[in-house]
Amino acid sequence: ALVTDLTYVRVGNRWAYVCLIIDLYNREIIGLSLGWHKTAELVKQAIQSIPYALTKVKMFHSDRGKEFDNQLIDEILEAFGITRSLSQAGCPYDNAVAESTYRAFKIEFVYQETFQSLEELALKTEKATLFCTTFIKCCLFRFLPML
């Protein structure tokens, strides 16, 4: 099962949006996209960045934001036989894994930075994703990451 959400990050004088897709099996970030607009297209780009066959995915969970609950995402999920799961309205606890991942992402990698471009944010996000993935694997195999 996969979970996802969007968050915003200050870039220059604007807000940029980050969409992360997390594998619930091991909490690995397996998909991501960044952009200036909070849209279904941003979610689609994150889905397309997943490095393995979507036919292996059984469930896709998100909140009820219009960028997730729409025809474009419905068509993608249906094409791969993926079951949709939506949080109850007004209940962030239903998407707790995504919420806690974003909290850690912002505390560890965003709040101490000042981003001037989307490219800077993309580089930092990719480094954060690599670190988190490496850290998870290190914890599973009991050694520390050497980055």
Q: Where do the PLM segments sit?
A:
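Charged DNA-binding/catalytic regions of mobile-element recombinases
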Residues: 1-147
